[in-house]
A protein has these predicted regions:
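Alpha-helical scaffold/interaction cores of sigma-54-like transcription cofactors
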Residues: 1-657
């Protein structure tokens, strides 16, 4: 069967631009009998792990659409011009180069509205393990042909041709040869993208010019889509994201179309072509069989590799040459002595016995040390004890960690799990471990908000600044927010009515248990394990919402605003923005910038791990939660007032007056 490999594909990790979840890309490939897909999100590789998981049975290729500065990337003079260049990892070494490239592009000295590099800096990573192709109308080669990027809005080929450089052939040839020299003769391809030539005549003109350059230089061409959603009909949902991104609505877009005014991201509002097409559709768009066949050549150049790993615990610096297991044993012996007053008090007041404590401690110790978790408990204990040594208040124990007697004996928690009949298995279930990988415990540690930065500094000093970083998290279009975005884009109702409608859509946290049951059922039925908050609200607040939308006996959504509710359900779960995770930090064995992309967090000015918590853990990294709790700050403030007599003095003065 004739086929091709889509090499230029965006997921929802291209925030408010790409719509598709990795699972939707995989489904589309299976529908079209395509062998796999690349993922080339804008300036990031944050979706690599989830994409590889979703592409089970298909070939995933990890790539990135880089932002290339035409000048020295350290110069920030108000010029925001950037070229687009797609780069793919051929193998595991190629992945490491992508990590290094995205990390460097996010350095504060290079980041300027977008993560960016210049070609000279990019060249040092092109050691034969990367494949590059030239890019679309926003590429370096396109800028060598057209002297004005107003070419995007040209209505005819004649208008576009009038914007070409007289010496475009020499300019483009020189640029193409430079890129081939950077990446290597067999690793650079000229990208032919004609999916939207009818709406953008400049695309057809660009393709003609690039094909000429290909013949002149011998650099082969490849055909690509510029997929921002999986299917043509998904275009309408992607436009909701675009309205959010450029703060507009469909009414304004239509008015601009009529008046001829420029529309930001206008191509997406005029076309449904930015999907993953079939081979036959790519031919209909105007690609040649050779260009499509060359995509399979590229795919065959890319090896299979696995980014996941069993946990790689950092080594705790134990004293006196002891192993981590020996040192943990020593601390537990001392902790047992220190906790005797509390343990004996519990024994005297309850039915529990000292033997029960010993058996539980030995059981936990065997389970945790047998799977090599001694270092983890030493790391957690060290952080807590250091904070207390600095006079900081810490929490008594949060969540399932209170079910560990080891943590209680060490003094990490102050909740006796035997006294309160708490289960160790809720904290750590060894039955989840496999021969390939073990699961890590999850200990949430509470600290004063005002002192949290000192904790982070201590951890960085202890394990090395290059091995410790906070991580990013993504906000998603979910429930109430998704419905509001759809209603705003359609100018469907007043702000006040919008609030009345969405008041009946609960927050995710309020119905987390119910949603989890829906997700599990969806998985059992062959789905992706997803659950819609909006649909849950329609089912459970039917009377409240029926004037706007309701579910009929056949399970279909009806009512005056049914289409908007359906669209909001479709975009639920789409990633919307990124920020620094409130609590999670990564402590890694390896230098972080070598194993995961480091990204620039604009709000804090910090460089953080550019992947989500679960993905980082899947790669073998250790996550520690350092939570800031305002109540601890208040308690410390009250203690200080008491300590220095201020509170007593104020009370006396108040009483005397």
């Amino acid at each position: 069967m004739t086929t091709y490999f889509p090499l230029h594909v965006h997921s929802h990790y291209s925030l408010l631009d790409g719509l598709s979840k990795p699972s939707q890309i995989a489904r589309r490939c299976k529908e079209l009998n395509l062998p796999g897909s690349a993922i080339t999100d804008h300036g990031n590789i944050s979706g690599a792990i989830s994409f590889m998981k979703a592409m089970k049975g298909l070939q995933p290729i990890i790539g990135c659409e880089l932002y290339i500065s035409p000048n020295d990337a350290t110069i920030k003079d108000g010029d925001r011009t950037l070229y687009h260049l797609c780069v793919l990892a051929k193998n595991m070494e190629g992945w490491r180069r992508l990590v290094q490239i995205t990390s460097e592009s996010n350095k504060p000295e290079h980041f300027y509205y977008k993560p960016r590099l210049d070609l000279d800096r990019l060249a040092k990573y092109a050691d034969g393990n990367l494949i590059a192709f030239s890019g679309h109308l926003g590429s370096h080669l396109s800028h060598c042909i057209f002297k004005d990027m107003a070419v995007h809005d040209c209505k005819t080929a004649e208008e576009a041709k009038a914007l070409t450089y007289p010496d475009w052939v020499q300019r483009t040839t020189d640029a193409a040869m430079r890129l081939r020299d950077i990446f290597g003769k067999d690793n650079f391809f000229i990208e032919i993208q004609v999916i939207d030539s009818k709406n953008m005549p400049a695309c057809a003109l660009l393709a003609t010019g690039l094909r000429y350059i290909s013949k002149k230089t011998g650099i082969p061409c490849i055909a690509t889509p510029d997929a921002h959603y999986a299917k043509p009909e998904d275009a309408y949902d992607q436009r909701i994201l675009l309205c959010n991104a450029i703060n507009t609505n469909f009414q304004t877009i239509e008015e601009k179309k009529v008046s001829g005014e420029n529309i930001g991201m206008g191509a997406f509002f005029r076309s449904r072509q930015y999907h993953i097409p079939s081979y036959e559709t790519m031919i209909q768009y105007g690609n040649t069989e050779e260009e499509l066949a060359n995509t399979m050549v590229v795919a065959q150049m890319c090896e299979s590799y696995d980014l996941t790993s069993p946990p790689k615990l950092p080594k705790f610096p134990c004293p006196d040459g002891m192993t981590s297991r020996q040192y943990l044993t020593k601390l537990l012996h001392q902790g047992w002595i220190d906790r005797q007053p509390q343990i004996q008090n519990t024994i005297n007041r309850t039915h529990h016995t000292e033997q029960e404590y010993k058996d539980r401690l030995n059981e936990e110790y065997k389970i945790l040390t047998d799977v090599g978790l001694s270092d983890y408990f030493l790391i957690v204990n060290d952080i807590i004890q250091w904070a207390r040594s600095q006079g900081q208040l810490t929490g008594a124990g949060r969540g399932s960690a209170a079910g560990s007697l080891i943590l209680y004996i060490l003094g990490v928690t102050h909740v006796d799990p035997i006294e309160f009949d708490l289960l160790f298995s809720r904290f750590y279930n060894a039955g989840r471990n496999t021969a390939e990988r073990i699961s890590l415990p999850d200990v949430d540690m509470d600290f004063e908000i005002q002192q949290r930065f000192k904790i982070l500094d201590y951890i960085r000093q202890r394990y090395g600044r290059e091995h410790v970083a906070q991580m990013l998290t993504f906000t998603r279009l979910q429930g109430r927010g998704a419905l509001k975005d759809v209603m705003r884009a359609h100018s469907a109702m007043s702000f006040e009515e919008m609030n009345r409608v969405t008041a009946f859509i609960p927050d995710e946290a309020e119905i987390s248990d119910q949603l989890q049951a829906v997700k599990e059922l969806d998985k059992q039925e062959g789905g992706d394990g997803e659950a819609s908050i909006i649909r849950w609200a329609l089912e459970h607040h039917a009377d409240d919402l029926k004037q706007w939308a309701y579910i009929d006996d056949d399970g279909n959504i009806q009512g005056p605003y049914a289409k908007l509710f359906e669209q909001a359900i479709r975009i639920e779960g789409t990633k919307k923005s990124q920020s620094k995770h409130a609590a999670g930090i990564i402590i890694a064995q390896d230098v972080l910038s070598d194993i995961c992309p480091m990204v620039y967090d604009k709000s804090s000015g910090e460089t953080i791990c550019g992947m989500e918590m679960n993905d980082l853990e899947d790669m073998g990294n250790v996550k520690i939660d350092i939570l800031g709790v305002a109540m601890l700050d208040k308690c410390h403030g009250i203690l200080n007032l008491l300590k220095y007599g201020t509170l007593c003095k104020e009370n006396n003065e108040s009483t005397n007056s």
